[in-house]
Amino acid sequence: MSAWNALTYEGKDTILRVVREEAERMFAMAEAPGAWEAPTAAGDWQVRDVIGHIVDTTEGYFHSFEVARAGSSREVHGLPAMHELAGAGGRSFRGVPQSEMMSRVRTDLDKILDLLGGISEEEWGSFMAPHAYMGPVPPSIYAGGQLMDYGVHSWDIREGIGRAHAISADAADLLVPYMFIVWQYTIRASADLSPFTIGLTVTGRNAGSYRISISEQGMSYEPGDVSDLPTVLDFDAGGLVLTAFGRINGGNARGNLELADRFLNLFYRI
């Protein structure tokens, strides 16, 4: 298995290293003069709300693991509720001074990296902790969640600054395997799920081609040849990540463009 696929244990050290790197870059931006109340590309969030969101989310992760270790459960809200609840959670810290929030987010980062760093190979993909929005998921998903927060929201902060910029290749490459899971969890309740299959190719350290099938059961995917399919979407790693998160409309489509449009509009954006 690849050290760049953090859904496997072989990728654990890589993703935890990149989470730390992305976090430190975010912290530097958040502490820049005048940045705290600056706008971002995450809806109406300001930079301080991004930091608040990460504190709220990370401390929720601690609770999830405590609950799981105790053999208990917690309320699961479902991903459709995440936009509203996560936004409220992030904004709830607006009255807390910047210095206090930055100290708290750094402490939380150290704690979550220690927690995830101590997860065994056996538990990385099998120990189930109840995520507030996704339900029971393994530690590999929590690591991905940290990289999504620090990687994608760093992109949001840079986008808010208004200068040309790019998502880091390390973050994007690591997030590629998670994007198929994001799509599985974000299909609109009103979506037309009459069956079809399309192809998707992606470049980077997790380069490959995938067959994605839609049916009444939702979305499934598997690696495979896509040359026989009516539509193929081509992405680089950053384009796939930012498209799956609704930040851009990226990639290019080959073949039946109407089918490509139908697929890309199946999902609500988080």
Q: Which residues are covered by each model-predicted region?
A:
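Non-cleavable N-terminal signal-anchor transmembrane helices
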Residues: M1-T40
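A glycine-rich beta-turn/hairpin centered on an aromatic-Pro dipeptide
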Residues: A172-I212
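C-terminal interaction segments
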Residues: G224-I270
